[in-house]
Curated annotation (Swiss-Prot):
Additional comment: This putative envelope glycoprotein shares many similarities with bunyavirus glycoproteins. Still tenuivirus virion have never been observed as enveloped.
Pfam families: Tenui_PVC2
Free-text description of this protein's post-translational modifications in UniProt: Specific enzymatic cleavages in vivo may yield mature proteins including glycoprotein G1 and glycoprotein G2.
Protein name according to UniProt: Putative envelope glycoprotein
Annotated positions for site Cleavage: S381, C382
Length: 834
């Protein structure tokens, strides 16, 4: 909700409750990000933050649960950055009850904005708004604060108190609550008046109020922690009839005992389908009856339109014998004739006369009318991709013309960009975009292990006991090695007091395939598509290049999402990896560095031509061994290869959705008069969302239009991740996405196309993620039943003790009881035999 609508809401409330909340001018430091950005201040940023636990539509830095995190998404405005340490204990505004996922006050509040761009500056004791301006963005980029905080970041779920005077801190309510043991049913945690942390496997969720909260994800056992400690809680499945309202039709039929009105519901469904069939038949009959009159009316309208274009010939102005006239030119005024023709021209005057074109009727204009209609229809696939446009006057030798410069932003492909000049209609088709980073090798490296190959004791120092590798008592080695000396003092040594221990450390390769550290030197791109003029292909687009040139336009790459395309990377075995400060490992926990070899052959064997490079605060050129046994062995860095990145001999390239948004610079050689965009009618379009919530890529959004359409857009729905929706002259389309939080099943939620801005209501039929806990059935009535049981008794007893330590004594008695019962059964069998 925007601030203006919120102020109307609060004004109505305050007629009975009090004065409105005194907010400062929020447009300058707090902007809603659920609407189209009216103004963007781009912030160059090199900050680092852990990834966010939830996923949002925008790419950038977020305040989530009171902490700064980084969210990676396809929509990137490059407008967030921060420096310093954010302190969530300093509230940004005294009336905020919740900000950035952290609860400050407990009061009767209202939502201000779900996601907002906020400028914040903090000192050691206070927090205040920061104006979102270019100067402040530069200040954030170049500052390095040790204390305090500066930032322009996204904040989630901002709420404010309607009556700030009645607000209480959450601790005041929690301290007066009743402490009970937490319980969990169907993923809903109940823990009255208690702030807690919930651990589910390796995930941790901080929840301000655990009174009744649906967990983002859960397991059969979760851990709930508060001020009093942590305790394990079992998430029990609810009764089957409790889920009756969330069941689909088939499940309700199977569980008919849960509903007393099932029979009436079934009759209602049958009646509904009968009504639908009857109305469908009536609609079909109406179409059949009105189809022939509709065509007749269309014919009359076309004849009426072309009849207005009919022009009768003006033959009475001049009488010309065409056999005696030589035509020089046919201009707008008519036929030009001259006196000095080959013919005598005795019947023509000196001045130019007009001859009307004879047209029998207006039917000749019907093809032109149909062509105009086709042009309008073809524009339905066009989108407004323009970020900026300007017309520039260019003059040469006193003659001037205009050229148009334009910047386009692509969020997905395929896309069509259509425009008009003074004479023609053009369309540029973008089927796909690929960016390639042309790279050169910086050096070659390999993973290694340390081996002490030589060791010798000396009683005299000789030329000196060095630890920096500048002197050695041995000759040079053919492999990469390091010689150093350690001085030690022992009273009972064979040397007088001091002795000197010389060691040679050799670095042996642990891989037969060396890696190459590459650096991107130039960026080129490829567009697969074409340029069309008046329905005819003017130029095909394709091939890696730095610029596309055509008789109409030149296209170059301006910007792209480089998160998956690093400037420097490690190429190992045909795959690309992020380059870290230590490449393939570290020398010890505080000393980072790498081995650099001039050729790949040297890196395979780690020859003496390789060098060790160290990165530290002192910027030491070589390793200094201070501890007795030298450095620790290499700790390998476990990393995954860059996803969807293709490696070639020229460099790396990327063509997936991770590449977007892509910005292109276009320079036209003709002035553009207008941009043609599509306006797709969504009337009669149905939309349905199905799948399983909180499972990655397990939700499907399906739309069906009443007629065939061209559509390539980004669909954003409430509670769902954005997904690309593409329809190529078809009626139905689907896209796969992820549902992040629950919405009532069967309700209608609002979805929006990012390019066109059109909205669509979709029916939400996503099944909640449920778990079922099945307990084993145990039979201890006889020794035969115990012997044939598939139950692992040791695991069962260990689970009993783990879930409830108080039962450890009882669990230890169970085996003894089974043994006694078995002996008793055996004695009874003997008595029966006797």
């Amino acid at each position: 909700m925007h601030f203006k609508s919120y102020f109307i809401y609060t004004t109505i409330f305050n007629m009975a409750w009090g004065a409105p909340i005194p907010f400062p001018d929020t447009h300058s430091w707090m902007r809603n990000r659920e609407r189209e950005p009216s103004e963007i201040v781009k912030v160059p940023c090199s900050a680092r933050a852990p990834p966010c636990k939830l996923t949002y539509e925008l790419n950038g830095y977020f305040i989530e649960n009171g902490l700064i995190c980084y969210n990676r998404a396809s929509v990137n405005y490059f407008e967030t950055c921060y420096t310093g340490n954010y302190d969530y204990k300093l509230p940004l505004h005294p009336s905020f009850s919740k900000f950035g996922g952290h609860v400050y006050l407990s009061c009767d509040d209202a939502i201000l904005q779900n996601v907002s761009l906020v400028g914040i500056q903090q000192t050691e004791y206070t927090s205040s708004p920061l104006l979102i301006t270019n100067s402040n963005s530069e200040k954030i980029s170049y500052s390095n604060l040790k204390t305090g905080f500066l930032g322009i970041v996204y904040a989630v779920e901002t709420r404010a108190c309607i009556q700030p005077d009645q607000a209480k801190k959450p601790e005041e309510i929690i301290n007066h609550g009743v402490a009970i043991k937490p319980s969990c049913t169907d993923g809903v945690l109940y823990y009255i008046n208690s702030a807690c942390e919930v651990n589910v496997s390796d995930q941790t969720f901080s929840i301000p109020s655990c009174e009744s909260v649906k967990l983002p994800t859960y397991d059969d056992t979760i851990e709930v922690c508060d001020k009093g400690g942590c305790q394990n809680v079992t998430c029990h499945p609810g009764e089957i009839c409790d889920k009756y309202e969330r069941m689909d039709m088939i499940m309700r039929i199977k569980n008919y005992q849960c509903s007393h009105i099932y029979r009436y519901s079934l009759y209602s469904i049958i009646l509904f389908f009968v009504i639908v069939i009857v109305f469908t038949l009536i609609t079909i009959m109406n179409i059949l009856f009105f189809l022939k009159p509709a065509f007749w009316l269309l014919k009359k309208v076309l004849y009426s339109m072309v009849g207005l274009c009919h022009r009768r010939p003006v033959v009475d102005e001049v009488s010309v014998d065409m056999s005696t006239v030589r035509v020089v030119d046919e201009a707008e005024e008519g036929l030009l004739v001259v006196e000095d023709s080959i013919a005598p021209n005795t019947n023509v005057s000196d001045k130019v006369k007009r001859k009307g074109r004879k047209v029998e009727n207006g039917l000749i204009f019907i093809p032109y009318v149909l062509m105009i209609l086709l042009l309008v229809c073809s524009a339905e696939s066009c989108q407004d991709l323009v970020s900026s446009i300007s017309n520039i006057e260019r003059c040469t030798n006193n003659s001037c013309d205009f050229i148009s410069k334009m910047k386009l932003t692509l969020l997905n492909t395929p896309q069509d960009f259509c425009f008009k000049t003074s004479t023609d209609v053009y369309k540029i088709r973008f089927n796909s975009v690929r960016v390639m980073c042309l790279s050169v090798p910086l050096y070659y490296t390999n993973s290694f292990k340390r081996v002490i190959s030589r060791e010798e004791w000396k009683c005299f120092e000789g030329e000196g006991c060095r630890t920096d590798g500048t002197h050695s008592i041995w000759g040079e080695s053919t492999s990469l090695s390091f010689d150093y000396c350690v001085t030690d003092f022992h009273i009972f040594s064979y040397c007088p007091a001091y002795h000197y221990n010389w060691k040679r450390i050799e670095y042996e390769p642990t891989s037969s395939r060396a890696c190459t550290i590459m650096k991107c030197m130039d960026t080129k791109f490829e567009i697969v598509g074409y340029i069309q003029k008046n329905g005819h292909v003017l130029k095909e687009l394709g091939g890696i290049t730095s610029k596309y040139d055509s008789p109409l336009v030149s296209i170059s790459l301006s910007n792209y999402n480089s998160a998956r395309m690093p400037r420097e990377y490690a190429e190992c075995d045909g795959k690309a990896y992020l380059r870290t400060a230590n490449d393939l490992g570290s020398f010890d926990k505080e000393l980072l560095g790498n081995i650099q070899c001039p050729t790949k052959e040297d890196a395979v064997v780690l020859s003496s031509k390789c060098k060790t490079k160290i990165l530290s605060n002192e910027d030491l050129p070589v390793i200094r061994y201070i501890e007795r046994d030298g450095v620790d062995m290499l700790e390998h860095v476990k990393s995954e290869p860059l996803k969807d990145v293709l490696v070639s001999s020229s460099g790396i390239s990327l063509s997936t959705l991770d590449l977007f948004p892509v910005e292109l610079n276009l320079q036209f050689k003709e002035a553009i008069t207008s941009i043609i965009t599509s306006k797709i009618s969504l009337n009669g379009t149905s939309c349905k969302i199905t799948g399983i919530e909180r499972k990655f890529k397990k939700t499907t959004v399906s739309i069906e239009s009443s007629n065939k359409v061209y559509l390539s857009d980004i669909l954003a729905c409430e509670g769902l991740a954005v997904c690309p929706m593409i329809l190529n002259n078809i009626k139905k389309g689907t896209c796969i996405t992820t549902t992040y939080y629950s919405v009532t099943v069967g309700s209608m939620i609002k979805c929006k196309f990012i390019y066109s801005g059109d909205t669509l209501m979709c029916k939400y039929d996503v099944s909640p993620l449920e778990i079922t806990v099945i307990s084993p059935s145990l039979d201890v009535s006889s020794f035969e039943a115990v012997k044939t049981s598939t139950t692992n008794w040791m695991e069962l007893l260990a689970g009993i003790v783990k879930d409830n330590p108080k039962l450890s004594l009882v669990a230890s008695i169970i085996p003894i009881g089974l043994i006694l019962k078995t002996i008793r059964s055996f004695l009874d069998d003997i008595r029966q035999v006797d």
